[in-house]
Structure formats: structure tokens, C-alpha cells
Amino acid sequence: MASKGTEGGHGGVERKEQQQQRGYQLPRDSRGSLEVFNPSSASSFRTAAAAPKSASPFLAIPDREEDNVVAQQRAAEWGLVLQTDHHTGLPQGVSARPSSGSARTSSEDNPQQQQSAAAIPRVSEELRAALSVFQQTFVVSDATHPNHPIMYASAGFFNMTGYTSKEVVGRNCRFLQGSGTDPHEIDKIRQSLANGSNYCGRILNYKKDGTPFWNLLTIAPIKDEDGRLLKFIGMQVEVSKYTEGKKDTVVRPNGLSESLIKYDARQKDHARSSVSELLLALKNPRSLSESSNNTLKRKSQESLSMSMSEVPSKRSSESGSRRNSRSGTRSSLQKINEVPDQVNRTRKSGLRAFMGFLGMGHGSVEKNMLKPRDEDPLIDSDDERPESFEDEFRRKEMRRGIDLATTLERIEKNFVITDPRLPDNPIIFASDSFLQLTEYNREEILGRNCRFLQGPETDRATVRKIRDAIDNQAEVTVQLINYTKSGKKFWNLFHLQPMRDQKGDVQYFIGVQLDGTEHVQDDAAKEGVVLVKKTADNIDEAAKELPDANLRPKDLWANHSKVVLPNPHMKDTASWRAIQKVLESGESIGLKHFRPVKPLGSGDTGSVHLVELLNTGEYFAMKAMDKSIMLNRNKVHRATAERQILDLLDHPFLPTLYASFQTKTHICLITDYCPGGELFVLLDNQPLKVLHEDAVRFYAAEVVVALEYLHCQGIIYRDLKPENILLHRDGHISLTDFDLSCLTSCRPQVFLPEDADEKKGRKNGSYPIFFAEPMRASNSFVGTEEYIAPEIITGAGHTSAVDWWALGILLYEMLYGYTPFRGKTRQRTFANILHKDIRFPASISVSLAARQLMYRLLHRDPANRLGSYEGANEIKGHPFFRGINWPLIRATAPPKLEIPLFSKDDMEKKGLVTNNRTDMF
């Protein structure tokens, strides 16, 4: 990390002397790293090379001393200290490193050096023990010192940089800088440190041997209860393998990025969340040791793929204090290995997808995850509520929607996508598996033609077949010898397949590689051909979710400029009449037609505002999203899908889209304003943070009806939670936020119950059942942490059954005040979702029917989950919903609550800014 400083005192004199000795005027190291921060106390923290050597111990053998120095350095890299006999110089074993993390050598016998070492801030023994649990790459620095010296460095930091503990502790992290380090990023770091704020960025650093590497640096401040700055934690992740590097600024002729996926923003999102695990240890070292899971070691993962994201909450209410029982924060750059080793051995393949890019691959639900529970799960448990934490960031992180990977990124196969519309048909996407196979970094291959895999023994006739297929826009499957970056050759069963757009024109080429050690014979080749062709088809379907990279930037948002036409049930409302009046005047609805009233919430891509249509008295909610952020966060296709979905909706429990338009910088959606706010806030306002069963039944029933309608339209919602359930003035619900939803086609079915024929069934009240569900499964890693279904985490592909899982979580939260699987960290939450049995606390009385419903909805196998066979009909028929008049549910009066939705004053005030909703249903 870096800091501001002024040059003075003996530090400035020493720097001048060093400049004279090195023969140049500006302070640079061997790599050309500038001392841009001008520390005032640099002399206090000399490197190992500059430190004076003390006399050798009596009778010490010189050669043995050299060996001991090497051993000391290796021990320091593991956080240990080599103990030697001061008379013989013989190693006597190792011991734990002092709390500062600094290994002592015989040179510390020098009194002057002892005094200097004593001035170095050191972490406490308790904190050192807590931090030693983590094997990630990070440092802790002293924020009370102007130079921010390092107090502690993890073993991962030594392994990544090549430096030893003696060379690191007490120094500022600027020694990692070099000639290629971007000074603008350094300025950002300095500003963050000066302000005591967070920083996350990718910078080019240098190892001790001069090797450059891309370092994803995340800095977070540690403050005491009074807000005083104490420490900084700096977490490093080497992302050289996966980042675009300097290619992130390369654009096509149309101005869009050359790469199909923007990795930089995604990596930063992951890292911001990951550092929260270390923050928890620094703020409360005992929290880890006191945890029942304190024996679980965090494993280091030096790739982008294992980190997690932090994005501000979508709605303003999320910044509030919500339930005291909410858990704290820890998210690490690691695979989900936060379960006992015994479980890990049996679950390894099932978690492989999550280990790749937080689930970026195809995994399966393991048998032991689906096995029946030994004890009766419906018996009330005496388990305590999850631990409460005061971490504001963690509270927000748990409740916000996350978008960790597209379906394309989760395909764990060796493949690339090229664009023939660009010169030389360059690579615009490469899978992580392809990078591992070929040993190249992503930065090295983006924008290049695939010919770099060829070598001396590559058959030229086979290469011509591939070129002819490209020229003819046809498929081809061949075997040829290719070479990795290190020169290792391998037989490649290569399949080339064109990907066409809706007009039939070739959009991309998909190249799938099936590697082998030798030439594959005919029978085996046929099996391989089937496999690579199937993979190519999956890639084709997944890539179609993303916008065409050859579109002009303005064309990406063209759908948002289309005029919105009223759907049948809402066209005669006062709101629609006001909108239509503007359109009839010949004007297009735009930002100029609305007056901002107040902000309603904000998120990582934009904000929501209450606005008034000028001179009408009609109020709406306007969602404004920043175009540049949408591009950088790979959310263009999400915004496009949300606009398409809103255009389809015509239901009382779902929002109405009145208009959409774009400005130079934003896209805007105009929908209903719900003065009742979020169900989340309503829950929070209740004395015990829970609702009684009648209220839960009412809200859950309306959610079921809304989800049933969405599924009939081919929409998988994927983000059900109290924050996304808004309340109208009449107390009825409206689901909102469809930016994580999936739109596909629908397959309607009508069938009779199996236990009766048509006549007998009608006499018994068993009428034909209408059932419709989205046809195409998805594999995106999206949702909200506590509500995500197991199949999303494992990467096994998911259907509309994920919405029924989320309904089970919603029921639990409304009844008990918290979600059943939440953990201190995101990884712990995900591990709980995959492994932990659901418990029903005895402290709150909940009916057997309610517990049965939650138990059946929270079945880890989606095929056996309630709602997977007959959809919403199965859920509607559950005993918990007995007494609900489904056809007339809109006429049902909302239940009375301990704290009502509106007070009398609220009714008077909010009634002035409420749409007049005519009941057309």
C-alpha cells in the first residue's frame, strides 16, 4: 500500500546518499520503481540487503551460517522462525513467528537494530493467531503511521512476491512497484489511504526477481468504535492468468470492447467482497476461534475465479440496520472448502463448478446432498439464531443481488470464440479451461488468431481444411497436433462451428478443443466428435444471451427507445391516460416530461426515483441505469431482458411499464410507484421482526400467483426476496426488479389428475390442471446470497424450480425473522445451502403445515422439490394455504399487523402521491 509523506530528517539524507551511491538522482530500485510517496521515515525500514551484518557467533561455521540463512528465509515464508544455537550455529527447530510476523536473525543482537525493530508496530498475539488461519495473500499495515508500514504479511504474500519476512515487515508496499505501474492507479491508492476509504484496482507489480504480474489489490480500512483509523488491510490476488490486462482498453471499430466479456469489473467485484473475511478477523479476532467451524482452514487461491463481489445495495432500505441477528462478513478468494474434510472428499466433484469461477462450470448435485435426513426435520429445534454482527458492509452484501457469471462463462470446456467480421478472425472469448490447456494467459491470446497453437509437426493439409471451412462458413472436425506455450505438443480433436444470428448471417465461429496425448482412432474419434459438437451447441445457445459485439453502442439500447403500448388490463387507468395524452401530442416520452420528487433507492448500476409526470399529479417510479457501468459490468443483456419482460407483464401483482427511454448516459424505465414500500421494511418495523401466520399466508399466496404468471410467460424470476416485494396502498404486493430474470419460451400443458378419469374427477372436484413452465434451463450464477438454490451454486443448470426454493426461504424469513442457511460469510452461506439441514427453532411457534411446506420447498433436488411436477398447483393445494380463495385473492383484505403498513398520517400524506389503480381484473 502507499501513502502520502514528506521527505525530511535523516530519511531524506539517507535517500540522497543512496542516490549518490547508485549514480542517479531520482529514487528508483532495480526495476525502476519510483519512490513516489516520499516517506519521512524510510531509514527506519531498510531492506535486508541494506541492514548491517552482525558478527558471527563464537565457533560458528560460515558455510553452516549461509545454510541457516536460507532455512530462516524458508521458515519465514511459512510464518515461522528458525531457532539456532548461538554458540554452534546448529538449527534447533522452528517456532511461531512473533506477532509482527518478522523473523529475527543474529543481526538483531545489534542494539541499534533492536531499537529500530522495537519501533515497528506489531499486531497482537491474538490477532496474529487469527490471521494465521488464513493462507491468502494479504498484508496488514499501521494506519496511524504516516508511512503505513506493514505489521503483518501472510505466507501467501511471501510466496507470491518472492520476498522474505525480513524484507517486508516494517516497509511500505511500494517496493512492488516498477516502471510499468500505472501512476494514475497509485494516485487513487494514495487518495484512498488519505481519506481512510476503500480501494480496489488492478495494477502491474513486480516480484523480487523482476517478474511482472497483474495484482488485483483491494484495500479496506479498519476503524475502532469511535471511527478512528487503526489499520489497513491490503489483499492481493494475482490475476495475470485471467485478466485482459492492457487489452481492456482495446476496442473494435464500433467502439465496443474487443473482448466479449469485461473481466476487470467482475474481478474487482469479487475481490471487494473477499476482503470482508479478513476484515472480520481484524475487527474481532476471537470470532473465528470461538466459531464452531474454527478448524476449517481457508485455502489460498491466487486466481480471480475464487473471489466475491461487493456492490452497493439496490435500495435505500438496505442500508438500514435490519435484524440484529444478521450475520457478519467473510468472503475469501477460495473454493468452497469450508466444510469438514470428510465431507469435502465425498462432495469434491459436486463442488467442482463452484471451485472454477464461483461455480463457473457444470457440476452435479451429489447423492449425499440429497440423502434423507436421519432425524425428523419437522421437530422444533433448540438451535440458536445465527450470530449477529455489526458489520454494515456484510449486511448490505447479504441482501443484494449478485451476478457472478453468465452461462457462457460456466461452461467448463476448452473453447474459444472468434469474430470473422474483424480482421484476421481474432479470438474474442477464451474459456478458463482453454487457458489451462494451452498455458497462455488471457491477455496473450485475446485479439489473436488461433494459429499460435500450430507448430513444426502440425499438418498443413489439416490447417487448410479449417481455413476452407471458415471461408465457406461451414462446420469441420479434424485432428491435428498443437503446442502449448511451453512447447509441449498434444493431439487436438478440434471442432469448428459457425454461430449465426437471427438473419442467418455468421456472427462468430466457435472452436472446441478436445485434447489428448495421442492420435485418436476412429471409434474413439466418433465419440469425441459427438462430445465437441454437443459442447459447441451449448456454447452457441449461451453466447446468444449476450449482445452482438458488432453492434454500435447506440444500437445496444435501441429497445429502450421504443414506445410502450398499454396492455389490456391497465389501459384505462389514470396513469395510462396521462401517458397517452403526451404521446398523442406527437412527443416521445423523455426525461423532460418528469419532475423528480425524491430518491427511492440506489444500486451498483443506477438508482430509483419517485417522479411526477409534469402537470398531471400522476406519480411513477423511474429506474435509471448508467450505460457505461452496464457495459463494464456485463449487464447489457440483463437490461435488455428486463425491458422485454416488463413489456410482457399485465398482472395486478406485477409492475406495469408505462414508458422507457434513454439519455446520453442512462437508460430509464417508468413503472408503478408503490407507496407501501418494501416488504423488507414492513418486516423490520414489526416488534419481533416477524409476521404472524395469517399475514405470511396472505403475502406468500400472492407471491405464488405472481410466480405462476411469470412461469406461464416463460420467465424465471431468480431474485425473490422481501426487498423485491413492494406494497401498494391497498396492501397487495407487486414483484419488482427483473434485471436478474431469465426470459425464454414456455411450454403449456393441460392434464387430468392421475387418480381419476374425467367424469369421476369432476364429481370429486378434480378438474383438469393447467401447468406451464419455462422450457430452457439456464446456468447463470445470479440471485441473492441467502436465497440462491443449490443447483445455481453447483452449476448443474437450473429451471423455474429455483423460484420455489426462494419461496421456501421467504416463508422462513417471514416466520422466523432470518433466513435458514445464512452464514458469517458468503462461502459459509453457500456451504450451508449445499449441506446444512433446515432447522425450525422452538422459540417461535409455527404450525406443522407451515414447516411441512418449507421443508418440501427446500428440497435440494429440484426434481423432488414441491412445484417441480405441477408447478404452482402443487403449492396452492398444500394444507398451509387452506382457506385461500385463489380466484378472488385480489378481493381479500390484507391482514392486520402489529405495526400497520400505514399510520393515519401516512395515509394522508402518501395518498397524495399514489396512482389510482382501477381494478380491471
Curated annotation (Swiss-Prot):
Cross-referenced Gene3D superfamilies, in alphabetical order?
PAS domain, Phosphorylase Kinase, domain 1, Transferase(Phosphotransferase) domain 1
Alphabetized CDD domains for the sequence: PAS, STKc_phototropin_like
Q: Which residues bind ATP?
A: 600-608, 623
Which domain of life does the UniProt lineage start with? Answer: Eukaryota
Q: What is its EC number?
A: 2.7.11.1
Instruction: Give all residue intervals belonging to the PAC domain.
Output: 197-251, 474-528
Indicate yes or no for the key word Aminoacyl-tRNA synthetase: no
- Which is one GO molecular function term here? ATP binding
Q: What is known of its domains?
A: The PAS (PER-ARNT-SIM) domains are required for the binding of FMN chromophores.
The protein's name in its UniProt record: Phototropin-1B
The record lists the organism as Oryza sativa subsp. japonica (Rice)
Name of the encoding gene: PHOT1B
